[in-house]
């Protein structure tokens, strides 16, 4: 890195480009693999989760218990879709061509055990096929590249709400929800807005409310036990008073338990037969059985965190003397700080032999584990110990302590609990927390905080699908085993391996989370792989999602991008990871920080923290000034602590952000001067960069942000060296590198079609003799230049109006951009035809097509397939095919005679593949899949032919363009070079934008980019200006002067038509402009004759169906207001759905006779038939006797008349 005498450094971006860097942050953390999250999640799934699931499901015992199948531990074997890593791309190409899946086979070893004889027989079987992740983080399903989007959902755990509004009523409630990953939801609530105290009720799933005292009594806790446990609480007393079952003194504890269990059974299992067994096992099965209730590791972690004592006893006063496990004594009345609270909690967790504390876990009074964990504790004896709680007395305020009020009881759950299902201590601690909230102890939860949300990545989603499939497999296997003799059973004949394959197929083809990959350009692809959605199974619904859920939250900082989200109904529900964001093993989002010790930054100590772990620490921004000794030299700094901002000194800081772009996503980080733009426009800018089409000649921006080179490193459009070595061969199709052990060959992509029809092309950027290191770029893919992302072009822009042509954001461009192919892109269209074969008929490929002009078949070869390289226009035949009309089945004799005399019966019709309207171009590739070549095709298919047509699209009027700052517009006119305003040296402008588009949009970034771009062009250099650490206005002024330009950035511009200067100098500079994937060629559409709807007989709608334009109610008013009755009559009858009359009009036009009057529109008949369906007969009464023509017309239509 070369240091200049100026206040910048020259830094290298990519293998070639150097840029001037003026940023303050000197130690930005290098961007890691931006696609690592999904790849790591998938690897975790195949390495750990499959084994865990198989251990859960097996052994499977036959329904007659004569035999069982056991899984041999750690016997999972995978057959990957490629033998060596370097073959992966070749296999992916094959899967795309043959429309198959890129998947791996899963083999396991099962042991059959016969109960009577004890005979054991091992067998290796195929369990199924699971799609395999590519090295770029996508999946190939039926030949299409797909992405599994991560989901952001509420984490399992306990959540408390104070004065929450209920959906059904206007009342406010206190609420406790215990959410599992799998199992029954528990909701505890009581109304807080009514004049009288309300009883606390519990709801399990969506059943009726149960009084909480009845619920506790079903485990054996009576009124006195409840008062002893939870202390004095008026809401609790009211709940006990309103409960009728519990205070009846003549009943024993066991009888009360039975009564309460019966009452709960009748509510939850309404209508089911009740028995002693069923009522006792109901709650224990629903809440404490690990097979039916699963919190997951995350849920247990969340529950233990929330139900510990720390949160509730911090900032309170002790009402009992405490000796901690460290031997520290805290007297009655001690103010409890966060540190003391943690020490008290740890005293309950400490092992008995080292524990000097007077705090110990105590048993819940009068509880018998056999009643609570009925039947479950037979298999799991450790549950008998899980009736312990941590308990302490405190005063919530100093006033309560001084008044010597009755202390509050605070109960925590068993901190040693690791079970992934609920325990009685969890329920008691949760109810204690709920009651504490009524007296102001504890905190309610923010459902929108990332502390309470977790990421479900691809691995976990596939684990869920595999679990469903294995449960189906278990059931099917058990039934098959029961139906066979023990000695006839083999692992293979009772295991249906189609279940897993089909479950995966269904998920990848139908799930909302499996998306067709957005491949318009490399940024779109990376953005799609880093997307997070709150929708989907178990998530939110876009129609009911409230504003609060969609809003940016303070915990998103450094984890979720606050800018990149769609406009429209999904705003705030579909999000993107921030650049440095990672996911930990529990699914919580983390962001990295540098550790700061006593004002000194340790750049080697990078800590990844979740939003929960950030509590209690102080954080500083990355743009603080640091000296050579890594000491922070600013005296006063803005500090973030507990999600609030305060002013402090360097000594107060615990952590430092790792980069100024830490807050934003990859797409938002690619916007220069992001900090000078309004957030709404930045949102549009980041979304529109994803729509930029790759141009024929890529050009890197003069003003970049530095993220472009990082994107190049991790994009699947590029190829990086796998090993160190020397380049020994380079051409347009492959690169060979000699390494220490072997020769690595890298095959390049040429004219490949992306999912969206844009071109994927790779050009070598290395030469023979170059030495490359592992991870170095070897090629530039589409939209890359010299190892940097290059989505658009640097164009000379003037902000001026011109004869009203740039009204309302329209754009005026120079004809040079068309002539020199500056904004020309290539679009590839795939057209497919199938040849079917059956017993009675078959499609025939031929050049001999009836009733087709020779001109449209001029480029066919002798087989009837288009030649590669042919120029084709709409209507040209691509593949000749004739199909039987299907009226008659020829006899064997007729077939023989036709074959002998080489005759073709006349009942064949032309069903050839023809070029669609607007898809003119050059045939670049033809692909034939046939059974002859050994390709696997569907039943009834003999062959499939795919023709690829490339279309060169120059920029034209109606195309959409945009900058990187949300400044978008449509081209309104293309001016000849000689008519374009030019600078004093004769340089014509490339593009004219309306200056009125800047002030109200508040995206000033484009103005700064324009001035800096002009300086860059004049100085022959390039700049980097990272997000939130960009080049300052004063620096830009200095650079303009250095380039011998006016520091205002304005220049004299001459109107070539008059030769006069414009009245005032205008802002002229270089802006990076993008051509978007909204081209007029895809949108322009007209219809003369086309298809009609079957029922209404009205023309179809939309370009894809060659439909018409809807003439709606308001358009009818327009014609009515002008009195254009004849036109109106035509539009609503002949041209729409009057079938009979439209045929008469055609006849009249052919015969040159008078056009008849219109008749009855078909929609009238539809109405008449719908009324008949409602048993109403619609008839027509004539008043004129001379309307013979009308009578005939009604007779023809079948409408009754009098």
From Swiss-Prot:
Signal sequence coordinates: none
PROSITE patterns found in the cross-reference section: RNA_POL_BETA
A GO CC annotation given for this chain: DNA-directed RNA polymerase complex
Pfam short name (any one): RNA_pol_Rpb2_45
Catalyzed reaction equations: RNA(n) + a ribonucleoside 5'-triphosphate = RNA(n+1) + diphosphate
BP GO terms, sorted: DNA-templated transcription
Top-level lineage group: Bacteria
InterPro entries assigned: DNA-dir_RNA_pol_bsu_ext_1_sf, DNA-dir_RNA_pol_bsu_external_1, DNA-dir_RNA_pol_su2, DNA-dir_RNAP_su2_dom, DNA-dir_RNAP_su2_hyb_sf, RNA_pol_bsu_bac, RNA_pol_bsu_CS, RNA_pol_bsu_protrusion
SUPFAM superfamilies the record matches: beta and beta-prime subunits of DNA dependent RNA-polymerase
Gene Ontology MF term list: DNA binding; DNA-directed RNA polymerase activity; ribonucleoside binding
EC number: 2.7.7.6
Gene3D superfamilies xrefs: 2.40.50.100, 2.40.50.150, 3.90.1100.10, DNA-directed RNA polymerase, beta subunit, external 1 domain, DNA-directed RNA polymerase, subunit 2, domain 6, RNA polymerase alpha subunit dimerisation domain, RNA polymerase Rpb2, domain 2
Keywords annotated in UniProt: DNA-directed RNA polymerase, Nucleotidyltransferase, Transcription, Transferase
Record's subunit section: The RNAP catalytic core consists of 2 alpha, 1 beta, 1 beta' and 1 omega subunit. When a sigma factor is associated with the core the holoenzyme is formed, which can initiate transcription.
Function text: DNA-dependent RNA polymerase catalyzes the transcription of DNA into RNA using the four ribonucleoside triphosphates as substrates.
Family listed: Belongs to the RNA polymerase beta chain family.
Protein name from the UniProt record: DNA-directed RNA polymerase subunit beta
Lineage of source species: Bacteria, Bacillati, Mycoplasmatota, Mycoplasmoidales, Metamycoplasmataceae
Name of encoding gene: rpoB
């Amino acid at each position: 890195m070369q240091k200049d005498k100026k206040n910048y450094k020259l830094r290298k971006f990519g293998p070639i480009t150097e840029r001037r860097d003026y940023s303050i942050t000197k130690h930005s953390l290098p961007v890691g693999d931006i696609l690592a999250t999904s790849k790591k999640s998938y690897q975790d799934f195949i390495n750990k989760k499959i084994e865990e699931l198989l251990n859960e499901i097996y052994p499977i015992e036959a329904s007659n218990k004569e035999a069982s199948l056991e899984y041999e531990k750690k016997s999972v074997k995978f057959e990957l879709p490629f033998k060596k890593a370097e073959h992966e791309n070749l296999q992916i190409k094959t899967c795309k061509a043959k429309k198959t899946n890129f998947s791996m086979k899963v083999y396991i070893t099962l042991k059959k055990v016969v109960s009577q004889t004890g005979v054991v027989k091992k067998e290796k079987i195929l369990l199924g096929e699971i799609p395999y992740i590519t090295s770029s983080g996508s999946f190939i399903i039926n030949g299409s590249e797909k992405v599994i989007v991560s989901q952001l959902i509420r984490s399992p755990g306990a959540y408390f709400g104070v004065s929450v509004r209920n959906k059904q009523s206007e009342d406010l409630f206190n609420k406790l929800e215990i959410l599992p990953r799998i199992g029954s939801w528990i909701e505890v609530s009581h109304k807080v807005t009514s004049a009288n105290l309300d009883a606390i009720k519990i709801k399990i799933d969506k059943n009726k409310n149960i009084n909480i005292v009845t619920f506790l009594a079903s485990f054996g806790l009576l009124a006195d036990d409840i008062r002893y446990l939870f202390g004095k609480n008026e809401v609790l007393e009211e709940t006990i008073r309103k409960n009728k079952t519990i205070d009846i003194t003549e009943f024993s504890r066991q009888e009360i338990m039975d009564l309460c269990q019966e009452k709960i059974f009748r509510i939850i299992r309404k209508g089911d037969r009740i028995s002693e067994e069923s009522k006792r096992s109901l709650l224990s099965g629903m809440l404490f059985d690990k097979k039916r209730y699963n919190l997951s590791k995350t849920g247990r972690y969340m529950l233990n965190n929330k139900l510990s004592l720390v949160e509730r006893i911090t900032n309170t006063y002790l009402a009992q003397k405490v000796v901690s496990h460290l031997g520290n004594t805290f007297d009655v009345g001690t103010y409890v700080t966060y540190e003391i609270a943690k020490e008290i909690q740890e005293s309950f967790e400490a092992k008995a032999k080292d524990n000097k504390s007077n705090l110990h876990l105590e048993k819940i009074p009068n509880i018998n584990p056999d009643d609570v964990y009925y039947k479950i504790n037979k298999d799991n004896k450790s549950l008998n110990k899980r009736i312990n709680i941590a308990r302490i007395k405190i005063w919530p305020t100093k006033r309560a302590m001084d008044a010597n009020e009755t202390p509050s009881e605070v109960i925590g759950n068993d901190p040693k609990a690791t079970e992934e299902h609920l325990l009685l201590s969890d329920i008691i601690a949760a109810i204690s927390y709920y009651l504490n909230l009524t007296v102001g102890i504890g905190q309610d939860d923010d459902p929108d905080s990332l502390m309470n949300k977790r990421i479900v990545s691809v691995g976990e989603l596939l684990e869920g699908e595999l679990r469903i499939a294995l449960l189906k497999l278990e059931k099917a296997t058990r039934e098959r085993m029961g139906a066979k003799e023990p000695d006839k059973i083999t692992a293979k004949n009772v295991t249906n391996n189609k279940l897993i394959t089909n479950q995966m197929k269904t998920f990848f083809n139908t799930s909302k989370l499996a998306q067709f990959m957005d491949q318009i350009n490399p940024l779109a692809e990376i953005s799609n792989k880093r997307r997070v959605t709150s929708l989907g199974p178990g998530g939110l619904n876009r129609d009911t999602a409230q504003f609060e859920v969609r809003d940016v939250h303070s915990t998103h900082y450094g984890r979720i991008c606050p800018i990149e989200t769609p406009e429209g109904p999904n705003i705030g529900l579909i999000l993107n990871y921030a650049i440095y964001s990672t996911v930990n093993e529990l699914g919580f989002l983390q962001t990295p920080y540098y550790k700061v010790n006593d004002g000194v930054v340790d750049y080697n100590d990078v800590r990844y923290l979740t939003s929960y772990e950030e509590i209690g620490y102080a954080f500083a921004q990355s743009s603080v000034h640091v000296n050579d000794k890594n000491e922070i030299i600013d005296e006063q700094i803005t500090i973030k602590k507990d999600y609030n901002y305060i002013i402090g000194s360097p000594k107060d800081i615990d952590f430092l952000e790792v980069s100024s772009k830490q807050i934003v996503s990859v797409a938002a980080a690619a916007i220069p001067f992001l900090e000078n733009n309004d957030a709404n426009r930045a949102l549009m800018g980041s979304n529109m960069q994803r729509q930029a089409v790759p141009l024929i000649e890529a050009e890197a921006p003069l003003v970049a942000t530095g993220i472009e080179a990082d994107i190049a490193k991790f994009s699947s459009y590029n190829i990086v060296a796998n090993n160190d070595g020397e380049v020994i061969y380079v051409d347009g199709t492959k690169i060979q590198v000699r390494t220490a052990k072997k020769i690595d060959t890298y095959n390049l992509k040429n004219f490949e079609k992306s999912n969206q029809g844009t071109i994927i092309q790779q050009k070598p950027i290395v030469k023979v003799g170059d030495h490359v290191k592992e991870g170095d770029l070897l090629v530039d893919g589409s939209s890359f230049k010299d190892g940097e992302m290059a989505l658009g072009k640097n164009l000379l822009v003037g902000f001026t109006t011109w004869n009203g042509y740039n009204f309302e954001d329209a754009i005026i461009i120079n004809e040079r951009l068309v002539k020199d192919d500056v904004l020309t892109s290539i679009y590839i269209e795939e057209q497919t035809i199938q040849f079917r074969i059956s017993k009675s008929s078959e499609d025939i490929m031929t050049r001999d097509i009836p009733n087709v002009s020779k001109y449209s078949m001029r480029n066919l070869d002798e087989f009837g397939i288009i030649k590669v390289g042919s120029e084709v226009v709409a209507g040209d035949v691509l593949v000749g095919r004739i199909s039987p009309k299907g009226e008659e089945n020829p006899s064997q004799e007729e077939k023989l005679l036709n074959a002998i005399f080489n005759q073709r019966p006349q009942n064949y019709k032309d069903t050839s593949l023809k070029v669609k309207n607007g898809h003119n171009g050059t045939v670049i590739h033809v692909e034939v899949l046939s059974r002859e070549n050994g390709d696997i095709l569907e039943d009834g298919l003999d062959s499939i032919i795919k023709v690829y047509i490339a279309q060169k699209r120059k920029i034209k009027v109606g195309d959409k363009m945009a900058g990187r700052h949300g400044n978008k517009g449509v081209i309104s006119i293309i001016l000849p070079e000689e008519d374009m305003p030019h600078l004093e040296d004769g340089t014509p402008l490339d593009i004219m934008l309306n200056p009125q588009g800047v002030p109200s949009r508040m995206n000033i970034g484009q103005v700064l980019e324009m001035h800096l771009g002009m300086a860059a062009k004049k100085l022959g250099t390039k700049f980097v200006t990272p997000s939130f650490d960009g080049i300052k206005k004063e620096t830009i002024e200095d650079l303009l002067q250095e380039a011998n330009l006016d520091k205002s950035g304005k220049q004299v511009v001459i109107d070539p038509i008059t030769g006069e200067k414009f009245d005032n100098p205008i802002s002229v500079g270089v802006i990076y402009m993008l051509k978007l994937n909204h081209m007029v060629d895809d949108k322009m559409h007209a219809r003369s004759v086309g298809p009609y709807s079957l029922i209404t007989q009205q023309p179809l709608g939309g370009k894809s169906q060659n439909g018409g334009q809807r003439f709606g109610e308001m358009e009818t008013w327009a014609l009515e207001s002008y009195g254009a009755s004849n036109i109106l009559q035509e539009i609503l009858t002949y041209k729409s759905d009057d079938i009979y009359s439209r045929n008469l009009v055609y006849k009249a036009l052919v015969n040159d006779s008078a056009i008849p009057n219109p008749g009855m529109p078909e929609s009238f008949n539809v109405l008449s038939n719908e009324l008949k369906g409602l048993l109403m007969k619609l008839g027509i009464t004539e008043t004129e006797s001379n309307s013979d023509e009308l009578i005939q017309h009604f007779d023809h239509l079948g409408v009754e008349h009098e």
